[in-house]
Amino acid sequence: MKNNSQLLMPREKMLKFGISALTDVELLALFLRTGTRGKDVLTLAKEMLENFGSLYGLLTSEYEQFSGVHGIGVAKFAQLKGIAELARRYYNVRMREESPLLSPEMTREFLQSQLTGEEREIFMVIFLDSQHRVITHSRLFSGTLNHVEVHPREIIREAIKINASALILAHNHPSGCAEPSKADKLITERIIKSCQFMDLRVLDHIVIGRGENVSFAERGWI
């Protein structure tokens, strides 16, 4: 009964002030629902966030790290992985249904949800029509921890196949630092030059790091 009464506090706070009023600890407690033996759910949530440093660290952790917290088992690990996947799918659906793109912020949020936590570099392309409405998005290339080989002609082939007029490029840095490398800049230039011959416009290249991202367009590089 103690766990249920502890959970009621963030729940009542949410109902009165809205979900955004909850702290990270309170929000996590809502999802966990129960604590462990001798530890109420709010205390458990606080301990978990302290152990992983942030919600990002918690939701992208592997089971070996997760199980190191005393009293935490596979059920709670599955719950939290489910939350992360729900968020990813939510942005996936939102991207399709809210075209054209509402803002650069929404684009970055979507890409962050898709590429955060990947252990290898993934190169992704969002394909848009002449009105900059999303046609589809695709993970075209997969690499290693610090490199992904990208072939501009394959990007162009896919764009022609679906009659795209514009592209947004994106890839992640598993290291966590979103600052573009020299290689990132060079491949972007190659893609832009290749696309110009086919009357395709590259709107941006966004590099995703751990809780941060860098836009080539905002830097004035495109």
UniProtKB/Swiss-Prot annotation:
Q: Where is this motif: JAMM motif?
A: 171-184
Q: Which PROSITE patterns match?
A: MPN (PS50249), UPF0758 (PS01302)
- Membrane-spanning regions, if any? none
Can you give the residue ranges of the MPN domain? 100-222
Q: Which InterPro entries match?
A: MPN, RadC_JAB, RuvA_2-like, UPF0758, UPF0758_CS, UPF0758_N, UPF0758_YicR
User: Which terms does the UniProt entry file under GO BP?
Assistant: proteolysis
Name of one Pfam family that matches: RadC
Q: Does the keyword Protease apply?
A: yes
Among the GO molecular function terms of this UniProt record, one is:
metal ion binding
Q: Where does Zn(2+) bind?
A: H171, H173, D184
Keywords from the UniProt entry: Hydrolase, Metal-binding, Metalloprotease, Protease, Zinc
* Top-level taxon of origin: Bacteria
Q: Which HAMAP family match?
A: UPF0758_YicR
Matching entries from PANTHER family are given as:
DNA REPAIR PROTEIN RADC (PTHR30471), UPF0758 PROTEIN YEES-RELATED (PTHR30471:SF3)
Q: What family is this?
A: Belongs to the UPF0758 family. YicR subfamily.
**Protein name, please?**
UPF0758 protein YicR
Q: Which species is this record about?
A: Shigella boydii serotype 18 (strain CDC 3083-94 / BS512)
